[in-house]
């Protein structure tokens, strides 16, 4: 309704972090929206080129939405170092997965959601705040902390948890951007927590700094295959060839 081309969060936990309210345009949902539009536009173009299906009107629609949303994403959320978690709540945290959409776009060979400079600056802030300054990097990347690595709410849930699947995705993003040592450090921390805790046959979604875990057998941990994709440029997994 506000003509910025980006989805608004309603102030309730209305996205995958379902105990973490966002208000207005958010970095997490906005970046995913832009990446989704890029994918939809590419699909429409491919369908027309490969099958002759007329998709000109869809391409025009997706393209206009994309132009509108792109022009407002940085304007509303970029703070000079990383992207604000959202445009209206004023929550002063570095959200670890704020550029999930940019990772997906780059992984799929689409137009990146943000500039390389902004991507690298954001990843640096995420590494320092949510990994290096959270338990010394021994657990993995926490979902969201203040820039100095302290919690906004010491009794918070989702912001203070390490989500295995989110971590594998973030590690893949670091690797995609040429920062393999950081990717390896994040993965090693998470895998060590899972295996040293005897959780390898019930991989949990969330691990905490007080030795608790929840949401076992969660499928988001399959994001670990993103590391294979970024490391091999989508080579087939050995033995997975189809006759």
Where are these regions (language model features)?
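Short, ordered beta-strand-loop transition motifs
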Residues: 1, 79, 131-135
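Hydrophobic, small-residue-rich alpha-helical packing segments that form membrane-like cores
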Residues: 2-46, 58-76
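Detector for glycine-centered tight turns/loop "hinges" at secondary-structure junctions
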Residues: 3-6, 80-82, 149, 198
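Short clusters of hydrophobic/aromatic residues that line enzyme substrate/ligand-binding pockets
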Residues: 7, 82-83, 139-142
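Active-site core of glycosidic bond-cleaving carbohydrate-active enzymes
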Residues: 20, 31, 35-45, 49-53, ...
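Short, surface-exposed recognition loops and adjoining beta-strand edges that mediate ligand/DNA contacts
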Residues: 67, 72-98
